[in-house]
Design a protein with these regions (language model features):
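Class I SAM-dependent methyltransferase SAM/SAH-binding core
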Residues: 1-37
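A short acidic, Gly/Pro-enriched loop at the edge of an enzyme's catalytic core
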Residues: 36-48
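A short SAM/SAH-binding and catalytic strip from SAM-dependent methyltransferases
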Residues: 46-60
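A short glycine-rich, Lys/Arg-flanked "PGG" loop and its adjoining helix->strand segment in the class I
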Residues: 63-75
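C-terminal alpha-helical "lid/dimerization" subdomain adjacent to the S-adenosyl-L-methionine
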Residues: 78-134
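Short acidic/glycine-enriched loop/turn segments that link adjacent beta-strands
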Residues: 135-139
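C-terminal lobe and adjacent flexible extensions of AdoMet/dcAdoMet transferase-like proteins
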Residues: 141-145
Length: 145
């Protein structure tokens, strides 16, 4: 009985999402907005999740998204993040030339890799998060309000 809302800044991605939603007969409310300022009502969600987003952004918008997630969540709600894991052995062992190539396609990777995500979430008002590896290069972060 969950009500699902999806959000994206790209009208093109939203058009694809709406098309696929209709194909599968899902009931999802798609919203065109920036994750930092959704315009959605305060305390209206039990779960907010973002997927492979933080590494695409500078630290300031990332922290703005954390604050927006906190605003959107009801007390006791969860914020789930899945993204690259800067502590991954795969990244640590990556030859410098490969890492340089990766960074050429990921301009904010250094900012993401230096972000203390646990501290940033606590500073945004969340309880200390649980962080788990979910693949050789990715992690899931769960923070409760």
């Amino acid at each position: 009985n969950a009500k699902v809302t999806g959000l994206d800044l790209s009208p093109y991605f939203l058009a694809v999402a709406q098309y696929r939603t209709r194909q599968r007969h899902y009931d999802i409310n798609w919203v065109h907005a920036a994750a930092e300022s959704t315009g959605l009502p305060d305390a209206s969600f039990d779960l907010v999740s973002i997927f492979l987003t933080c590494h695409e952004l500078p630290q300031i918008p990332t922290m703005e998204i954390f604050a927006e997630a906190r605003r959107l969540l009801r007390k006791g709600g969860y914020f789930a993040i899945m993204d690259m894991n800067p502590n991954s052995e795969n990244f640590k062992r990556m030859p410098p030339y490969v890492l340089t190539l990766l960074k050429s396609t990921e301009p904010y990777l250094d900012e993401y890799f230096t972000l203390d995500i646990e501290q940033a979430l606590v500073a945004a008002g969340f309880n200390p998060p649980r962080i788990r590896e979910n693949s050789p290069r990715h992690r899931t972060i769960i923070a409760q309000l």
